[in-house]
């Protein structure tokens, strides 16, 4: 008898791309393909484990592998749970989940005039609700969640390029994102900080038309009592968190900084926090201002 072969961990990066129907899985697959990944679209969940095993074979010539999967082909979570139990999580095996609001998904399905794959004889919202309920455990098991509600296909492709190109040696990719609470808290945020404890430059006429990127606004915001103290204390508090992410092989983190409209305080603080986090070892930082220009 032949001895039973031991399980090999993936030798290439393997990413499982999933999420809500209409949230942009195909766009992400195309973007990864442009970055040199070998992309398998609409892979049946039952084929996930053989694909990961293939990536674990020494000498395989496949590049980085991405499998785009939805929930229609079987019990996805049981398959995913089996894979994570067998191979473990780590820098070579990741799960990317694409999220979007109900309103954004309804708008996209209506634009293409197609039914939701799970709506059956019900409404479009019924299908979305059914899928969202199925995906709760998968979302919680994901390494990275991207909310595509406010992104068009070009912006989503750019986001994927920023996240997955050219920094394989970075321990953690951190996105510092400013936002306005009146537009909703980012669904993909790992941590959220509220800047509404600071005076609002909106009520200063000469600052109102400017943004937190402008020096006058930045000086005003960071010059308020407690502002600089908060930013530096928050950066110090994040340092051991991000170091822990690296130890646990969590390669992405989104830190959301909010104010009322996402134009002044959150933008200024996000820029300052980003500059401090860039000094941390093993951390690659990008800064995004989700709601600039919405007013």
UniProtKB/Swiss-Prot annotation:
Entry's Gene Ontology molecular function annotations: ATP binding; GTP binding
NCBIfam families assigned to the protein according to its UniProt record, in alphabetical order: PRK05416.1
Binding site for GTP: 70-73
The entry's keywords: ATP-binding, GTP-binding, Nucleotide-binding
Matching PANTHER family: RNASE ADAPTER PROTEIN RAPZ
Family named by the database record: Belongs to the RapZ-like family.
Function: Displays ATPase and GTPase activities.
Top-level taxon: Bacteria
SUPFAM superfamilies referenced in this protein's UniProt entry, alphabetically: P-loop containing nucleoside triphosphate hydrolases (SSF52540)
One Pfam family linked to the record: PapZ_C
Record keyword GTP-binding present: yes
Binding-site positions, ATP: 19-26
Protein name per the record: Nucleotide-binding protein CMS1991
Organism of provenance: Clavibacter sepedonicus
InterPro entries: P-loop_NTPase, RapZ-like, RapZ-like_N, RapZ_C
């Amino acid at each position: 008898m032949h001895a039973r072969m031991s399980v090999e961990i993936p030798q290439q990066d393997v990413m499982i791309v999933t999420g809500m129907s209409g949230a942009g899985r195909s766009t992400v697959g195309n973007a990864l393909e442009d970055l040199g990944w070998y992309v398998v679209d609409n892979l049946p969940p039952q084929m996930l484990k053989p694909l990961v095993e293939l990536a674990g074979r020494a000498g395989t010539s496949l590049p980085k592998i991405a499998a785009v999967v939805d929930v229609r082909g079987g019990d996805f979570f049981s398959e995913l749970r089996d894979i994570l139990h067998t191979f473990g999580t780590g820098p070579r095996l990741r799960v990317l989940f694409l999220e979007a609001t109900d309103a954004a998904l309804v708008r996209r399905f209506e634009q293409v005039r197609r039914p939701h794959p799970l709506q059956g004889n019900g409404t479009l919202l019924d299908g979305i609700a059914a899928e969202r309920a199925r995906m709760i455990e998968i979302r919680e098991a994901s390494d990275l969640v991207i909310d595509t509600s406010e992104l068009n296909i070009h912006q989503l492709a750019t986001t994927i390029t920023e996240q997955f190109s050219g920094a394989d040696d970075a321990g953690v990719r951190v996105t510092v994102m400013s936002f306005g609470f009146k537009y909703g808290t980012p669904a993909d945020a790992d941590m959220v900080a509220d800047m509404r404890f600071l005076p609002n430059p909106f009520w200063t006429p000469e600052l109102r038309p400017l943004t937190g990127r402008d020096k006058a606004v930045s000086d005003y915001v960071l010059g308020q009592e407690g502002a600089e103290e908060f930013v530096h204390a928050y950066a110090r508090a994040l340092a051991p968190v991000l170091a822990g992410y690296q130890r646990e092989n969590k390669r992405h983190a989104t830190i959301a900084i909010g104010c009322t409209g996402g134009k002044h305080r959150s933008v200024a603080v996000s820029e300052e926090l980003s500059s401090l986090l860039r000094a941390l070892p093993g951390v690659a930082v990008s800064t995004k201002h989700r709601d600039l220009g919405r007013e």
